[in-house]
């Protein structure tokens, strides 16, 4: 039940519960001795421990800001392709440095909270590190999108660009759905998120088929065009990975 509620594996739950099992607070069958729990960690009433609530709010706000920042990073990266604009691509890459710093801030904050109160090892707050790491990974793939403009001056043809626009739309929706589902507990959005992932994979297949068709018409001696196909394929893959990471 714990694994299902938090969306993590049973093995991970077992690892998290081990310290409490060793202290005989949680029985082997995972029956919690609430009296002993309160003696060791304070009241089990979620409204009692205001420090816990404030810690949640602090890190949740950091994650919301990180999600908004990453969406802006993806947006600017794709805008650089739409406009074939090197300066926009460079600015998008600069945003990724901020994304990395935001991840470190979330990680250090969670570590500090857990070190002060070991009870947090059993709470949702430990999953915030993983969520922040996933936002950082999305930022990395956004960087791959921006680097296309820096590495290649060839504008994307209209047909392929139309597919990429769809993939960008699904990527932005996926980030939003995942954030609302995780932070706000809007689990009903999981269906919408899975729909986005399915549509993303469909568009990825369409894009790669289009690229393969264009490659077949290109001479092997055309090195510049060959490099273009490598770079644009990375863009397609990056959008797909953003969708997959959002589901994670």
Regions inferred by a protein language model and the residue ranges of each:
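Cytosolic, long alpha-helical scaffolding segments
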Residues: 1-248
